[in-house]
Amino acid sequence: MKISEEEVRHVANLSKLKFSDDETTEFATTLTKIVDMVELLNEVDTQGVPFTSNVADNINYMREDVSVAGWDREQLFKNVPEHEDGLIKVPAIIDEGGDA
């Protein structure tokens, strides 16, 4: 199944991505090869092969909940550029003023 360059551009546009013409051509070629390989699975004869939903025997294995000591705060803060009141200080990413 051939993936067209137009389809690549359409999906890129929906994803807010921009590609050069060369990149678009390369993506179309690569995606076509991937889809062709996946379509080969349709040719596999699975008649008589039992359905398998899970091959692991240890379904829902839960470990014991054990409390352990955490990290030493002073040791952790050695690599932190800025901290305040025992918390790591990071740059603001949301402007508190104006409309969102």
From Swiss-Prot:
Its EC number is 6.3.5.-. It comes from the Bacteria. InterPro entries: Asp/Glu-ADT_sf_sub_c, GatC. Transmembrane segments: none annotated. This is Aspartyl/glutamyl-tRNA(Asn/Gln) amidotransferase subunit C. It is an enzyme of class 6 (ligase). Heterotrimer of A, B and C subunits. GO terms for molecular function: asparaginyl-tRNA synthase (glutamine-hydrolyzing) activity; ATP binding; glutaminyl-tRNA synthase (glutamine-hydrolyzing) activity. The keyword Nucleotide-binding applies. HAMAP family: GatC. Belongs to the GatC family. The keyword Transport does not apply. Allows the formation of correctly charged Asn-tRNA(Asn) or Gln-tRNA(Gln) through the transamidation of misacylated Asp-tRNA(Asn) or Glu-tRNA(Gln) in organisms which lack either or both of asparaginyl-tRNA or glutaminyl-tRNA synthetases. The reaction takes place in the presence of glutamine and ATP through an activated phospho-Asp-tRNA(Asn) or phospho-Glu-tRNA(Gln). The lineage of its organism: Bacteria, Bacillati, Bacillota, Bacilli, Lactobacillales. Keywords: ATP-binding, Ligase, Nucleotide-binding, Protein biosynthesis. It catalyses: L-glutamyl-tRNA(Gln) + L-glutamine + ATP + H2O = L-glutaminyl-tRNA(Gln) + L-glutamate + ADP + phosphate + H(+); L-aspartyl-tRNA(Asn) + L-glutamine + ATP + H2O = L-asparaginyl-tRNA(Asn) + L-glutamate + ADP + phosphate + 2 H(+). It comes from Streptococcus mutans serotype c (strain ATCC 700610 / UA159). One of its GO terms (biological process) is glutaminyl-tRNAGln biosynthesis via transamidation.
